[in-house]
Amino acid sequence: MRVIITGGGTGGHVYPALAIARGLKEARPGVELLYIGTARGLEADVVPRAGLTLATITVQGLVRRQVWKNIPALVKTGRGLGEAWQQVRRFRPDVVVGTGGYVSGPVCLAAALQGVPVILHEQNAFPGVTNRLLAILARCVCLTFPEAASRFPRRAKLVTTGLPVRPEIIQADRDSCRQHFGLRPEQLFLVTVGGSQGARSINGAMLPILKELAGCQDVSLLQVTGRRDYEAYLQQVRTQGIDLAKYGNITIEPYVYNLEQALAAADLVIGRAGASFLAEVLARGLPSVLVPYPHAAANHQEYNARAVARQGAAVVVLDRELKGGRLYQVVFELLRSREKLKAMAAAAASLGRPGALEAIIQVILKTVESG
């Protein structure tokens, strides 16, 4: 079996693609995989590191608010379509899997025009423009959120599978992870992950929360600031008179490589509403306070957050509300109500789809078998 996987630009498109690639290798050890991306996106770094062959094509994203700037992008996309055509023709795949991003457009279009079955995966509640345009050419569109269905053409074949998460997220043992962080059984563990984009506003809103929690025996806090803001944030913490060494229940890190351990140990999570992060939070059955990144394309993070909040698994705090103290209010209301946290955790667990990867792999295998 020969499979082309394409998707790029950001982690939201690349990491689900890598999870699918790993799932295909496990399901069909002899599978031949080719990843098609760009030389400038995240995929240029992480795909070779994952042991996959990467081919690149020329493509450039469109500028939505300044149409006149799109002429060079359209020229590059035309060139990219020709390059994608050659890659598909040369590799002769049984199926092409696209996870979104501008690079997947030319690749999936070239495949469809050559009669190769195309399967798409959409990560967000508000689907990306590339997947919406490609949907009528695809054999199947795998959705993370059922709410996304209404934004696709009626002719599109849709199935809700969820978003594949790393096996480590699901397999991490809660008890051993809590021991790793030195937590007592009755102690609540609050984890704040600002994300690579726009962590600064969340960091600033966390300062009064840190001040209130400093020395609290009932709550431990891990805050991940992002590398860019780490030193400046530590200085802000010191300016507020918070002595981290003295109190011991607050840990501030620029980045964590063991996020699966932090999520397994957590009782409440604060973070952005990117699809991959949300899928991991829900797979762990975690209550969350979601602060959508306000500059995400088509405001898709707010759509993601609202979809989870409607089911009772999260509380949404908009970025513009952070300066008004709403994050402080929401966090302490939740920390004071273990029953509320328990109810939100149950709702999150009901939304989590730990079998998402297997469901997507089955869609791919059935498509190949049917020809």
UniProtKB/Swiss-Prot annotation:
UDP-N-acetyl-alpha-D-glucosamine binds at T10, G11, G12, N124, R166, S196, Q301. It is a peripheral membrane protein. Pathway: Cell wall biogenesis; peptidoglycan biosynthesis. One of its GO terms (molecular function) is undecaprenyldiphospho-muramoylpentapeptide beta-N-acetylglucosaminyltransferase activity. Keywords: Cell cycle, Cell division, Cell membrane, Cell shape, Cell wall biogenesis/degradation, Glycosyltransferase, Membrane, Peptidoglycan synthesis, Transferase. GO terms for biological process: carbohydrate metabolic process; cell division; cell wall organization; lipid glycosylation; peptidoglycan biosynthetic process; regulation of cell shape. GO terms for cellular component: plasma membrane. It catalyses: di-trans,octa-cis-undecaprenyl diphospho-N-acetyl-alpha-D-muramoyl-L-alanyl-D-glutamyl-meso-2,6-diaminopimeloyl-D-alanyl-D-alanine + UDP-N-acetyl-alpha-D-glucosamine = di-trans,octa-cis-undecaprenyl diphospho-[N-acetyl-alpha-D-glucosaminyl-(1->4)]-N-acetyl-alpha-D-muramoyl-L-alanyl-D-glutamyl-meso-2,6-diaminopimeloyl-D-alanyl-D-alanine + UDP + H(+). The keyword Cell cycle applies. This is UDP-N-acetylglucosamine--N-acetylmuramyl-(pentapeptide) pyrophosphoryl-undecaprenol N-acetylglucosamine transferase. Gene3D superfamilies: Glycogen Phosphorylase B. Belongs to the glycosyltransferase 28 family. MurG subfamily. InterPro entries: GlcNAc_MurG (IPR006009), Glyco_trans_28_C (IPR007235), GlycoTrans_28_N (IPR004276). SUPFAM superfamilies: UDP-Glycosyltransferase/glycogen phosphorylase. It is found in: Cell membrane.
